[in-house]
Each structure stands twice: as structure tokens, then as C-alpha cells.
């Protein structure tokens, strides 16, 4: 919760690659089911992207999520510093309630004054394209609410089970992949 004891109305996810694309895609696709704060995604090192996002938000009701596997990615760190400065310029109290970090490098995170209880850690071995199923999915959880997020995870588990247990001729991911290969290599379609 923000310092004013109300609920956050906005969440800014600062990340790039897998720390941005997956959560951004899912929150966009599931927008009709949102039951939480509005999520904004900033990945561009061009400061105009972040400034355009910040100008319409109330820092008192905004949570900044800094998502970076290594916490050394220049685009993410540059935007994170700017967002932290924005909070400091507008809030007279400690900004720690308005910051969380998601990273596999907690040592680096702590250099930014983010305490252990505000860090969601994940294994360095988790690849970017799969990270939305773990802590990187925090913006999805916040946007959807706990119940709908658990339904989302349950659906993913069902598809995993389907993939591992169905015969090839009944296996939807395999059939889609084979159809894609057929369209591209045999039919010579230039797009999917």
C-alpha cells in the first residue's frame, strides 16, 4: 500500500525484453478482466516514454516496479533512476513503499536503497520468455487480482499437461507448429 494507506491506482513496470514484453502482452490481452491498478510499461531509454507516463500520474498512488534479471541493464536502470527522482521530488516522506524490484541480483538491487522485503527474487536460470510465470508476472497479478491471476496460472498448467500428455495428433501446440511449418515451407506463405 502507498504511504497514504489507500490503494495504488497505478503501477509502472520498468523493464526491457522478458521483463517487459510478457507482462505487457498479458495485461493488454486480459485488459477486460482487470480488477486492480492500471499498469503502465516503460522500456524505452528515450526519457520521453517515461515522462509521458509520469505526467498524468499521482506519485502518492503510484507503485514503481523495477524488473531486471541482472539489475544492470542500462535502459532499465536509467528509467528507474528517473522514476525514483520523480518520487523523491513529489513525496515528502520515505518513498520505499512506492518501490519494488524483481531481480536475480539482490546485491545490485540493494544499492538503490530497495530493502529485502521489497525484492521479488528469481533464479538467474529463468529465461526471459518464461519469466512472466514467476515474479516478473507481478504486474499481471496486480492488474488482474489474485483470483484471476491464479486462474491464468492454472490455464498455463493445463496447457503444459496437455502438451506433455497428448498424442502428437491431438497435441494442439504440436499441430499449430506443424501448420506453421506447412504454411511457410510448403505453401510459401510469407506470414503466419
What kind of region is each of these model predictions?
Residues 1, 26-28, 32-63:
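Glycine-rich oxoanion-binding loops at beta->alpha junctions
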Residues 12-22, 69-77, 106-108, 127-128:
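Gly/Ser/Thr-rich loops at beta-strand to alpha-helix junctions
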Residues 40-54, 67-78, 96-100, 123-130, ...:
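Alpha-helix capping and helix-loop boundary segments enriched in small/acidic/polar residues
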Residues 1-9:
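Cofactor-/ligand-binding subdomain signature composed of acidic, glycine-rich
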Amino acid at each position: 500500500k502507498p504511504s497514504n494507506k489507500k490503494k495504488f491506482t497505478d503501477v509502472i513496470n520498468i523493464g526491457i525484453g522478458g521483463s517487459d514484453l510478457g507482462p505487457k502482452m498479458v495485461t493488454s490481452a486480459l485488459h477486460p478482466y482487470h480488477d486492480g491498478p492500471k499498469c503502465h510499461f516503460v522500456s524505452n531509454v528515450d526519457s520521453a516514454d517515461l515522462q509521458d507516463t509520469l505526467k498524468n500520474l499521482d506519485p502518492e498512488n503510484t507503485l514503481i516496479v523495477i524488473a531486471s534479471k541482472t539489475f544492470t541493464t542500462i535502459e532499465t536502470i536509467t528509467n528507474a533512476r528517473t522514476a525514483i527522482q520523480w518520487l523523491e521530488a513529489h513525496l515528502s516522506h520515505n518513498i520505499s513503499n512506492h518501490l519494488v524490484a524483481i531481480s536475480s541480483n539482490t546485491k545490485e538491487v540493494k544499492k538503490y536503497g530497495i530493502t529485502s522485503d521489497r525484492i521479488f527474487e528469481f533464479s538467474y536460470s529463468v529465461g526471459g520468455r518464461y519469466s512472466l510465470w514467476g515474479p516478473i508476472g507481478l504486474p499481471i497479478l496486480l492488474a488482474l487480482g489474485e483470483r484471476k491471476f491464479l486462474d491464468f496460472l492454472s490455464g498455463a498448467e493445463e496447457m503444459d499437461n496437455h502438451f506433455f500428455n497428448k498424442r502428437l495428433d491431438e497435441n494442439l501446440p504440436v499441430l499449430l507448429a506443424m501448420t506453421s511449418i506447412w504454411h511457410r515451407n510448403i505453401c510459401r506463405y510469407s506470414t503466419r
